[in-house]
Design a protein with these regions (language model features):
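Surface-exposed amphipathic alpha-helices with a cationic face
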Residues: 110-114, 155
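Generic structural signal for well-ordered alpha-helices
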Residues: 61, 106-110, 151
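Catalytic His-Asp segment of secreted/periplasmic serine-dependent ester chemistry enzymes
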Residues: 127-208
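Conserved, well-ordered alpha-helix/loop/beta-strand core segments that scaffold catalytic motifs
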Residues: 74-75, 121-125
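A short helix->loop->beta-strand "cap" motif at the edges of active sites that frequently abuts
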Residues: 34, 117-121
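Proline-centered loop/turn at the N-terminus of a beta-strand
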Residues: 10, 120-121, 164
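Conserved SGNH/GDSL esterase-like catalytic core that processes O-acyl groups on lipids
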Residues: 5-104
Length: 208
């Protein structure tokens, strides 16, 4: 697919350990022809501020970007669910946001980055289904939220800002029956899992 719009372009990825591991980026790069890929993922960290892993919170990592990218992917949510970070509510564009909620941190980050880099093609990915440490697609966390609630929040945010959303929660094929085939521990993808993510992501990115 060397004649697509991303040939020679730059791509930054923000997220947690699934991003930090660098498993999907080289596969997507080979497929789409990105010339530069920078990985800002931080293992174990949520989007939301206020956890004991605050220094790596995606909301802060994203703000540290010091250059414009042609494409920017935000892939977060599973640690917010696991660490019982408050979901919050979607607020109008331009509001004062609470970085200690998932919605607030996500909206705050998006607004800061879009203000700085309005031409960047930002895209949001929902968290994958999981089944680890007693946290799966059916369990409510200590805040009363399902993982699907965080995935739905990402979709709502994407719609509010007219940003494309890749709903990996719904279309990746990761579920309780397949997690042993796609992950090492029913959370973190193995080689086959990253291949599946990359295939899905490449088609998505090629279309935006």
């Amino acid at each position: 697919m060397g004649n697509n719009r991303w040939q020679g372009a730059s791509w930054a990825t923000l997220g947690d350990s699934i991003t930090a591991a660098g498993g999907y980026q080289p596969l997507v790069q080979a497929e789409l022809g990105f010339a530069k890929v920078d990985n800002f993922g931080r293992g174990g960290c949520p989007m939301t501020a206020g956890s004991d892993r605050d220094d790596g919170a995606t909301v802060y990592m994203g703000r540290s970007l010091e250059q414009a990218y042609d494409c920017l992917t935000i892939f977060a949510g599973t640690n917010d669910y696991r660490l019982n970070m408050p979901l919050g509510v979607l607020r109008p564009i331009g509001s004062a946001f609470d970085n200690h909620t998932f919605f607030g941190a996500y909206q705050s980050l998006i607004e800061e980055l879009l203000t700085r880099y309005p031409l960047c093609r930002m895209n949001l990915w929902t968290p994958l289904q999981r089944d680890k440490d007693g946290y799966d697609s059916e369990k409510r966390n200590d805040k009363g939220c399902l993982l699907a609630d965080y995935a739905a929040a990402v979709q709502s945010i994407g719609q509010a800002y007219a940003l494309p959303v890749l709903d990996l929660y719904a279309v990746s094929g990761f579920n309780k029956l397949t997690l042993d085939s796609f992950t090492n521990d029913r959370l973190h993808p193995n080689q086959e899992g990253y291949r599946r993510i990359a295939q899905t992501a490449a088609s998505f990115l090629a279309a935006i």
